[in-house]
């Protein structure tokens, strides 16, 4: 298999994981997209010189009936993504379209100035950056990984009232945890985790994102 074939296969797997991640966050993703075969991926996204057209990989997805609750996924070209891409290609499009959440998938770590730009932009937007290597496989598909459910504000309030606790009294999970990143956890949110004991009975625990 050639290097180009390897790259196509890698990006095919990355795209599949991204779509699964969006689905697991509650966004509407077509089954036909989730189940796209590699051959179909090549026909759809590799029309020039057997190379993936990353611009065509762009995703726009909605969560539930609210059209304002939308997310964009960007796949910038080039091995190293810097400030111009983050500010001009990502942030400007999100602002123009009034989309407040976005994911940027990059081949390798973004530059230090780009990280600073993302941090600054995240005061107004939510921009997540994933490296392709993090998405080649879906970490939630491992049989030992527990199922996560991110509580909305109403469910969180009900939980805290039921147990008469403050959210800060719950066990914590870092927003940098790989599973927290997969589910897009923000600081202050609560996640419900389904676990199984030795008898295969399910039980639930809760974590407060910090």
Curated annotation (Swiss-Prot):
Keywords: Nucleus. It comes from the Eukaryota. Its main location: nucleus. It holds the Pfam family RNA_pol_Rpb5_C. InterPro entries: Arch_Rpo5/euc_Rpb5 (IPR014381), RNA_pol_Rpb5_N (IPR005571), RNA_pol_Rpb5_N_sf (IPR036710), RNA_pol_subH/Rpb5_C (IPR000783), RPB5-like_sf (IPR035913). Gene3D superfamilies: RNA polymerase, Rpb5, N-terminal domain (3.40.1340.10), RPB5-like RNA polymerase subunit (3.90.940.20). This is DNA-directed RNA polymerase subunit 5-like protein 1. It comes from Arabidopsis thaliana.
């Amino acid at each position: 298999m050639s290097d180009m074939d390897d790259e196509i296969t890698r990006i095919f797997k990355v795209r599949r994981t991204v779509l699964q991640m969006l689905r697991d966050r509650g966004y509407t993703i077509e089954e036909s997209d989730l189940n796209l075969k590699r051959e179909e991926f090549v026909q759809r996204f590799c029309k020039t010189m057997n190379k993936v057209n990353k611009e065509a990989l762009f995703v726009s997805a909605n969560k539930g009936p609210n059209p304002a609750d939308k997310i964009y996924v960007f796949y910038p070209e080039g091995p190293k993504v810097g400030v111009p891409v983050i500010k001009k290609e990502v942030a400007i499009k999100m602002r123009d379209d009034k989309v407040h959440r976005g994911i940027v998938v990059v081949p390798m770590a973004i530059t230090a100035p780009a990280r600073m730009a993302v941090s600054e932009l995240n005061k107004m937007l939510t921009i997540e950056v994933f490296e392709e290597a993090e998405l080649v496989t879906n970490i939630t598909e491992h049989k030992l990984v527990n199922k996560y459910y991110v509580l909305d504000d109403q469910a969180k309030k009900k939980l805290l009232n039921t147990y008469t606790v403050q959210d800060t009294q719950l066990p914590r999970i870092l927003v940098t945890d790989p599973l927290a990143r997969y589910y897009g956890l923000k600081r202050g949110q609560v996640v419900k985790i389904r676990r199984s004991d030795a008898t295969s009975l399910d039980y639930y625990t809760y974590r407060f994102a910090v």
